Every structure is written in C-alpha cells, then in structure tokens.
Amino acid sequence: MTFTPGGFERSKVLLLGMKYNCSWVIQEMGEYPRTVDVFGHEMLSMKWILKNAPSVVLKEHELQEYNKKMSHVFWDLNTWNEFYKRENIKFAFGTRFHGNMEALRNGVPALWITHDSCTAELTDFLHLPKITIKEFSTIKCLDELLEYCDYTELRKNYYDLCKNYVDYLTENKLAHKYNLTYESGE
C-alpha cells in the first residue's frame, strides 16, 4: 500500500491499509509520520496527522503501531525487489505511481488510485488499472479493489507502448538493446 499525504480522502487509503495490515511502502520522507517526545513517551505528532492523514485522527495509537510494524522505506531497488519476494506480496494499491510500478515490475498486480491529473494521465496513457479517489471513497474492503484490477487494456496495448518507446529511443539516437517482434496475445 502506498499513500500520498494530505487531505481527508487520500488518508482513507492509509485507513484501508491499516484495516488489512498491509505493508506500507513510504516513498519520501514527508510521508513518514513525525513523532514527538511527551514526558519520555514517543507519540505521533498531532500536527503531522492533521496535515497529512486527517481521517486517521481518532486512531492515533493504531497508526503509531502500524507505522512501527508495517512501514518500509527502501533506498535502492534491489532491497525493494527482495522485499516483494520475501514478504510474498500478492496485491498492491495506492496513490503513489512509482510504488505501484515497482510492484508491477515484480509481478504483483497493482491498482492505482488516481488523486491528481498527473497520475490520471500516466495511468490512462499506459492503460493501467485505476480508480479515482472519489470511487475509492466508496470502497469498504480489499476484495472490492481487486474487482478494478483488470489488465485487459494494458495487454491489448502493450506492444504499441513498447514500440512507441523503442521508436523514441531510436529517433533520438539513444543506445538500446530492444528488438521488437510482434506476438499476438490472442
């Protein structure tokens, strides 16, 4: 699970991850919950929660435990790839484009939750499975997300996407090792 901090709707992604004890892949330090020391006890910063995850405000202690047990930060792709294999991750979802791409690169089905125009445009162009943040607000359980995870359009368009990429590299005289041959997926 990935989530982009900020706003009530986006923080519902974090809530669903917490509900199902999903691994939380943190992709930038701004996503990492801030803590404060209160009389010798480390606690989550209420300021961080209100700004970044307001729908979790009444679950502060749950979030603190979830963060300790389930959050992961990767500094290199090899470690991230090993994590997917070691933890036997079966499904990824969230608002972070690159987090879902890394899951997909590792053979893990992923569902993008589009919360901005950039993510929507990228998922449209690549024909990736997605739901809008508004659609996500109606989701009650993880199984409902799986219903949206359809790769039919990506499979249909994969060759053309690859050809477009290789043509770009060739046209711009960028060295590559790609040699495309068309194989019908039908």
What are these regions (language model features)?
Residues M1-E186:
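Active-site anion-handling motifs in enzyme catalytic cores
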